[in-house]
């Protein structure tokens, strides 16, 4: 049955699915594709026993198109906010920051500590094969996967092999040229 609104028509079957604390958009997409396929099989195998049910309209939100500027990481935000943002932006558009006038795409990171930082937000505090620790206004973001412009996605250990003097460098929201 067709309906005039966007995703507002009656449904034959509905399922819930948990979202883990470290789930990326890419992972959620794949999990929901599997769940959706199973739901289709369930409905089609016993179609007559399913009755269309009107969807609730309360609490429904519309996800607008992600704009390019939304990918820019604002280091004055808490580390936990940035880590969630990066998970939501994987596989598109990724997070963007600038290091020494070079655009970097950040793919994955974890938030550590929830304390206010004395370092300037965006300052690289520590580098190891486990990740690149960056000061945020609140907490530290450990970057674990990133990409140089025109390059391929690398884990932190691979990335730091091509960069000297990262500790103390400041990541920016814009190109500093």
Named regions from a protein language model:
Residues 42-98, 105:
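Active-site-lining helix/loop region of Rossmann-like oxidoreductase modules
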Residues 76-177:
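An anion-binding loop in the catalytic cleft
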Residues 9-10, 62, 71, 102, ...:
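A generic secondary-structure signal marking the coil-to-beta-strand transition
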Residues 1-63, 67-69:
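Donor/substrate-binding cores of folate-linked one-carbon enzymes
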């Amino acid at each position: 049955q067709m309906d005039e609104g966007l995703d507002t028509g009656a449904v034959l079957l509905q399922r819930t699915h948990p979202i883990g604390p470290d789930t990326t958009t890419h992972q959620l997409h794949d999990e929901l594709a599997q769940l959706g396929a199973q739901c289709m099989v369930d409905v089609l195998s016993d179609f007559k026993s399913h009755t269309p049910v009107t969807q609730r309209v309360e609490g429904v939100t519309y996800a607008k198109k992600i704009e390019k500027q939304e990918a820019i990481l604002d280091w004055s935000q808490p580390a936990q906010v940035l880590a969630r943002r990066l998970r939501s932006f994987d596989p598109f558009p990724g997070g963007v920051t600038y290091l020494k006038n070079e655009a970097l795409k950040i793919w994955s990171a974890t938030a550590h500590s929830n304390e206010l930082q004395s370092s300037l937000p965006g300052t690289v505090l520590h580098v190891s094969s486990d990740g690149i620790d960056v000061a945020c206004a609140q907490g530290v973001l450990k970057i674990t996967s990133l990409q140089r412009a025109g390059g391929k996605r690398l884990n932190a250990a691979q990335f730091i092999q091509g960069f000297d003097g990262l500790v103390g460098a400041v990541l920016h929201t814009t190109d500093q040229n």
